């Protein structure tokens, strides 16, 4: 349900963009994002930090896009957000010596340090690839292609990354289960 709520503003943006253009789509995205955050707060009593950050960026860049009637602001948002997420993951691992993914999920999952490090680097790489893809698609393809890729391409890539994460973690989770059963 939560993932569906997170996807609704994007689908609304895409639909309104195709039907009415950039300005109306940006306004729709901003309003839908604010409503989404309110609904998340009401239903789940908490909004994750990453959701707040995304919400703030969407509202800020969405307002700029609507005001100037220029899709480039939302294109920059995607690049900045992916770069920011990659930077946070890399800094957590190489500066603070503890992957942020481990800090977030370490209570739910018991994994060896090298697995946490690879997982963290894998997601950092994913965000860097998304950032670079966004730059290429933003500047070398039409706005229509970018809007379609933003809506469906990044969603598909995220799904593939999540599945790859599950496949990577599965053998390690099995080892943890076997260790717990032997104890």
From Swiss-Prot:
> What is the organism field in this record?
Actinobacillus pleuropneumoniae serotype 3 (strain JL03)
Keywords from UniProt, A to Z, are:
Cell inner membrane, Cell membrane, Membrane, Transmembrane, Transmembrane helix
PANTHER family with a match to the protein in the record: INNER MEMBRANE-SPANNING PROTEIN YCIB, INTRACELLULAR SEPTATION PROTEIN A-RELATED
* Topological relation to the membrane, as annotated: Multi-pass membrane protein
Q: Which domain of life does this protein belong to? A: Bacteria
Q: What does this protein do?
A: Plays a role in cell envelope biogenesis, maintenance of cell envelope integrity and membrane homeostasis.
Task: Note whether Kinase occurs among the keywords.
Answer: no
Q: Which Pfam families match?
A: IspA
Where in or outside the cell? Cell inner membrane
Q: Name one GO cellular component term.
A: plasma membrane
Protein name (database record): Inner membrane-spanning protein YciB
Respond yes or no to whether keyword Signal is given for this record: no
Major site of localization recorded for this protein: membrane
> Per the similarity annotation, which family is this?
Belongs to the YciB family.
Its transmembrane ranges are 19-39, 53-73, 76-96, 121-141, 151-171
């Amino acid at each position: 349900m939560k993932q569906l709520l997170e996807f609704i503003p994007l689908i609304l943006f895409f639909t309104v963009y195709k039907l009415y253009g950039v300005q109306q789509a940006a306004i729709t995205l901003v309003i839908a994002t604010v409503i989404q955050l309110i609904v998340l707060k009401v239903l789940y009593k908490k909004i994750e930090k990453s959701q707040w950050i995304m919400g703030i960026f969407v509202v800020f860049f969405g307002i700029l896009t609507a005001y100037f009637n220029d899709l480039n602001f939302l294109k920059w948002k995607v690049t900045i957000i992916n770069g920011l997420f990659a930077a946070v993951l890399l800094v957590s691992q190489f500066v603070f010596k503890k992957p942020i993914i481990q800090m977030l999920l370490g209570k739910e999952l018991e994994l060896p340090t090298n697995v946490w490090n690879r997982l963290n680097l894998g997601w950092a790489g994913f965000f860097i690839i998304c950032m670079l893809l966004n730059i290429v698609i933003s500047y070398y393809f039409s706005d229509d292609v970018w809007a379609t890729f933003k809506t469906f391409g990044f969603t598909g890539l995220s799904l593939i990354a999540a599945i790859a994460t599950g496949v990577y973690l599965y053998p390690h989770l099995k080892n943890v289960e076997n260790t717990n059963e032997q104890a």
